[in-house]
């Protein structure tokens, strides 16, 4: 399989403090990578570097197969919609095509079709004319995932997508993301605190550690590694 993203000896800082040191890993098209790690280990900094919005202190990130940073569909951490936010579901999803639209004043019929297909794929097409504030937390995340899907050519980057959702909505969203990976062959990079779900769904694990070397490998290799002992043990408490 073709490499879609390669990170070589990446070093990056947050507020002048080095949080990522000589990190190397790569993922191929169609893989599902979960990024784990304790608070302060550099997960958010890595996301910003992967998106191209934060320069690294050293090393390099290479996107493969002609992919550009604007071709990455990004779903940020869940935050409640602002009171009075006027946009409809279809307007929010269509905004995911801004990178495709460029400097044109209006969206093309092809871009509108991409948005419609994304809403259908996420099961929210019947909510297209609803206001964002009318949606449940799970529906809002599906809407934002549909927007990210409009941007994504081959890669989705999801930052703790189930944070704040109830168990039912979380399970449904995990299932949708898995289908996008398995059926649509979309490459997934997901930051997560849920080790059990990460081991269940991912094909690769990247664990960032603030006090020791980082880990990159398969879920099976991670589960049997010394690095996993602390994290898995903590979640069993």
What are these regions (language model features)?
Residues 36-38:
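The feature captures the beta-strand-to-loop junction immediately N-terminal to the Walker
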Residues 167-169:
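Helix N-cap at the start of a conserved alpha-helix in ABC-type nucleotide-binding domains
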Residues 156-159:
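Catalytic Walker B motif of ABC-type/P-loop ATPase nucleotide-binding domains
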């Amino acid at each position: 399989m073709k490499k879609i993203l390669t990170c070589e000896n990446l070093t990056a800082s947050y507020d002048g403090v080095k949080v990522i040191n000589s990190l190397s890993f790569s993922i191929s098209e169609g893989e599902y990578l979960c990024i784990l790690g304790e608070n302060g280990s550099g997960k958010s900094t890595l996301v910003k570097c992967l998106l191209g919005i934060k320069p690294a202190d050293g090393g390099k990130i290479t996107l493969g197969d002609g992919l550009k940073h604007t071709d990455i569909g990004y779903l940020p951490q869940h935050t409640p919609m602002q009171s009075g936010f006027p946009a409809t579901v279809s307007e929010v999803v269509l905004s995911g095509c801004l990178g495709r639209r460029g400097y044109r004043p209006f969206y093309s019929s092809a871009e509108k079709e991409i948005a419609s297909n994304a809403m259908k794929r996420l099961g929210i097409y019947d909510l297209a004319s609803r206001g964002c504030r009318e949606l449940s937390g799970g529906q809002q995340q599906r809407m934002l995932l549909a927007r990210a899907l409009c941007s994504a050519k081959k890669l989705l980057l999801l930052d703790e997508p189930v944070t704040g959702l109830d168990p039912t909505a979380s399970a449904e969203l995990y299932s949708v993301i898995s289908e996008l990976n398995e059926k649509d062959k979309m490459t997934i990079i997901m930051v997560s605190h849920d080790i059990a779900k990460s081991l269940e769904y991912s094909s690769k694990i990247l664990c960032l550690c603030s006090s020791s070397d980082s880990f990159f490998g398969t879920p099976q290799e991670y589960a049997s590694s010394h690095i996993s002992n602390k994290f898995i043990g903590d979640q069993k408490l």
